[in-house]
Amino acid sequence: MDKRKELDLQKKATQIRKYIIEEVFSAKSGHPGGSLSCTDILTVLYFDEMNVDPKNPKWPDRDRFVLSKGHCAPALYATLAVKGFFPEKDLYTFRKADSYLEGHPSMRYVPVSYTHLRAHETP
């Protein structure tokens, strides 16, 4: 990876971390540690590796991301907002009444396809 790309990813990761802290602080609820710990991974995946299109989130040939760590919703939401899937201002509605940014991600509301299963659930 060239230095310019690496610097760009570092800047995006820094912005995502800032949003994670702001989401959790604004909601007065959440798990910042888990979200902060996966920021670099999400940044590289969404901004350098995965084939996704914020303008066409249901694109049949898109790559899929499986989130098995539901408490990292703030990191996923911040990454998706920075990528352009929804307005960054929506991050400040995290865990608020009537917000689509719930404490655990839900395919019903966030404009991408992913799944969060508990141990007792089946796909």
Locate each region found by the language model.
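A glycine-rich helix N-cap at a beta->alpha junction
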Residues: 85-93
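Active-site catalytic microenvironments for nucleophilic, acid-base chemistry
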Residues: 44-48, 82-83, 122
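An acidic/histidine-cluster motif and surrounding catalytic segment
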Residues: 94-113
